[in-house]
Amino acid sequence: MSLPSRQTAIIVNPPPPEYINTKKNGRLTNQLQYLQKVVLKDLWKHSFSWPFQRPVDAVKLKLPDYYTIIKNPMDLNTIKKRLENKYYVKASECIEDFNTMFSNCYLYNKPGDDIVLMAQALEKLFVQKLSQMPQEEQVVGGKERIKKGTQQNIAVFSAKEKSSPNATEKVFKQQAIPSVFPKTSVSPLNVAQGASVNSSSQSVAQVTKGVKRKADTTTPATSVVKASSEFSPTFTEKSVTLPPIKENMPKNVLPDSQQQYNVVKSVKVTEQLRHCSEILKEMLAKKHFSYAWPFYNPVDVNALGLHNYYDIVKNPMDLGTIKEKMDNQEYKDAYKFAADVRLMFMNCYKYNPPDHEVVTMARMLQDVFETHFSKIPVEPVESMPLCYIKTDITETTGRENTNEASSEGNSSGDSEDERVQRLAKLQEQLKAVHQQLQVLSQVPFRKLNKKKEKSKKEKKKEKVNNSNENPRKMCEQMRLKEKSKRNQPKKRKQQYIGQKSEDEDNAKPMNYDEKRQLSLNINKLPGDKLGRVVHIIQSREPSLSNSNPDEIEIDFETLKASTLRELEKYVSACLRKRPLKPPAKKIMMSKEELHSQKKQELEKRLLDVNNQLNSRKRQTKSEKTQPSKAVGSVSRLSESSSSSSSSSESESSSSDLSSSDSSGSESEMFPKFTEVKPNDSPSKENVKKMKNECILPEGRIGITQIECSVQDKTSANTTLVHQTTPSHVMPPNHHQLAFNYQELEHLQTVKNISPLQILPPSGDSEQLSNGITVMHPSGDNATTMLESECQAPVQKDIKIKNADSWKSLGKSVKPSGVMKSSDELFNQFRKAAIEKEVKARTQELIRKHLEQNTKEPKVSQENQRDLGNGLTVESFSNKIQNKCSGEEQKEHQQSLEAQDKSKLWLLKDRNLAREKEQERRRREAMAGTIDMTLQSDIMTMFENNFD
């Protein structure tokens, strides 16, 4: 025989659970009917119920250890048969069978199994349907069933077997008349222990508690209805623990103690406890079922396998127990109710880890509880609770019933009298404590009021003293007052309660126009200021203190005058602080006006400089007619160099002033051409050194050095400062470059510095289309050729005509900030190419200078020969002018071509910058918009790849 066959032979299924009540004490109640027709029917139709519709077949499923682990098997078919055959006495027994079925599944299977998930789904449906079950259990057709002979046997059986209410009955509160037995824990172990305790021990426990009487709580109806039946003490002792379903008896036939208990229940409870019962109903509502269901029942330690639960949690609590206490009026005030609810949540937090699912559910349910509990109104302390008056009423009525009941009532009454006396003393102590607290709370406010009066007196004294003090002290006191105003909000929080009544009395009521203006001002406030408005209203209006701060409706007719005045102060203060931006605009406008004034002053200075240059030009023309000697020419050269340096200084100073208002963009755009400072003008010592070092050729007048100060594009005023320096002397601090005229013209086409025209030296001034003329006196050039050893720098004058037209042109063409940035980027890009071009030109210059130095002795000999022949200076200068006339025409044509090229370069640069700006704007516009079709295409591609 194989091993599986042996195992199948060993596995034996036990007989199914019984479903016929052999004791024939089963009943049919409204709750049992609901369980049969609604709960069981819905569970049976559920798609996950098929594993639970029949008893577990251990042989077929090959589960040899199932019935060794599960001692009390249960299934839906057995429950269905028991309901059909009236097996159950009350609904709590049927509910216990359902819970047993689910706990067996959780006990045998692992937590992650499919069968466990199916059981959890069924249990959720079961609890949901169970919450809709009628709360009061009533027997259906009970009067026909109950007979005279069997009533006594039912009472004896119930006294022996069911001495305490069932745990599940405590959870769902299905009793019409609350139980009067001593409170037991909800665990099934205590149920078994309670069954072993006899009725006499229960009576002793009830007497010691002294709350309710034992004698005839469950006396059968026949003992009251029939006059012939005898009343025996032994019978009453056995009939103590009859199940608490009493609906089959009329109310006028019930024993006295039960009628007295109904009177006690009808007494009015406090307003706080009513709110607590509403909170409990809210927590048990359907909308909170998804996260409140673990707290409906006590923790089933055996089913969940939590063997160390009671070692960690000493005081278990659940919503079912809290509801039972609330129904039995065990809560004397709302704080005891809140203590039990919070104990339930603390037990959950204590036993479970913080990241557990039950902890998150507990936090959600606790948020619901705390939000509702915070809205309970506060009530004053009463002299005597109603519950103790109720017990006295039950005593006096109970003493008149029987002798035995009166004796037991006396013993319980004595204990109750002692308790009432103790409670009265405790209440007196509480009153004394409350009075002390009120006195202590009023003392600091009195002190604060005294401090206020003192501070007012001190302020008056300070005002009198301040009239005789210096203005500096007055300023210091003003600063101190401002600091005190800043610190006032902290003091207001402390003095608010004491000043509240005074503010309400002194506040002036608002009329309709003021209220309307206040509402308009509140609507003008920004969103961050509205929170303070809500805080002011809630702090001053008790009726709105519990309202939601996110959404609040304000009715100005219901608000107090003090609240409205406080709102008016706050709103006016906020609106005063807001209009700070218009003055800034005024300041900006004033800056622009100053900027324009500076420009006008600089233009006037430029015109003055031009006038001075014209006067000097006339002086130089008059000097041409006088004959000059070699020595005199040298002295005259030194004077002209000094005058040129002074004129260059004046021009450079004017250019510095004109460029001071610019934003410094010239240093970034054109780093090779910077402003000329006064310190850079050639001194006499430098001129002497230059005489000893270099000699220029005959046809060459001088190599000019250009210095451009390019202003900001908003000013659009450009000036050129031409200064003659030796060819090889180039100060590195300002990156000055020396070129001949042809090379400068070619460089201008590359750099596109300005539309100014640089002309070759000539005696006459040629006016260009741009309105700028460059003057080159010929007389000075003739005198310079008399020196054979060296060549001194020659002055060149600049005259700017039509300055107003240039100003209007600069103002009319104002590129935007975006164009400016693009031009800067493009110029930086051109920087490398320009530097290469400059290096090449400097190398060519050096090479040409070397060639010219070899020709210089020949030129000096020719000059001496001409002087020996008796030629005058004027004839010599005429020769030079005739030689240079052809070259000037060529250079003029080249300059015009260079200007055309520069215009083409400018047009190209502008078009390129415009295209870049359009592209940038298009990208910004595309970045701001969302292409929904592209997004949908991306999502479809993602879904296809995901599948």
Curated annotation (Swiss-Prot):
Residue ranges of the NET domain?
Answer: 500-582
| Sections of the chain in a coiled coil | 417-470
Cell compartment(s), UniProt? Nucleus
Checking InterPro entries in the record gives: BRD4_CDT, Bromo_Brdt_I, Bromo_Brdt_II, Bromo_chromatin_reader, Bromodomain, Bromodomain-like_sf, Bromodomain_CS, NET_dom
Q: Please, which domain of life does this record's source organism belong to?
A: Eukaryota
What is any Pfam family matched here?
A: BRD4_CDT
Give one GO term, molecular function aspect: histone H4 reader activity
Q: Where is the composition biased (Basic and acidic residues)?
A: 470-481, 674-690, 849-865
Q: Which SUPFAM superfamilies does its entry note?
A: Bromodomain
| Site-annotated residues for Histone H4K5ac binding | N109, D114
List, for all copies, the residue spans of the domain called Bromo.
Answer: 27-133, 267-376
Q: Name one GO biological process term.
A: male meiotic nuclear division
UniProt region (Disordered), positions on chain: 395-421, 444-512, 610-690, 849-873
**Any one annotated GO CC term:** chromatin
Post-translational modifications:
Ubiquitinated in a SPOP-dependent manner, leading to proteasomal degradation.
Its domain comment says: Bromo domains mediate interaction with histones that have acetylated lysine residues at specific positions. Bromo domain 1 mediates binding with histone H4 acetylated at 'Lys-5' and 'Lys-8' (H4K5ac and H4K8ac, respectively). The bromo domains also recognize and bind a subset of butyrylated histones: able to bind histone H4 butyrylated at 'Lys-8' (H4K8ac), while it is not able to bind H4 butyrylated at 'Lys-5' (H4K5ac).
Family statement drawn from the similarity comment of this UniProt entry: Belongs to the BET family.
Checking PANTHER family in the record gives: BROMODOMAIN TESTIS-SPECIFIC PROTEIN, FALZ-RELATED BROMODOMAIN-CONTAINING PROTEINS
Name of the protein in its database record:
Bromodomain testis-specific protein
Recorded source organism is Macaca fascicularis
Chain's gene name: BRDT
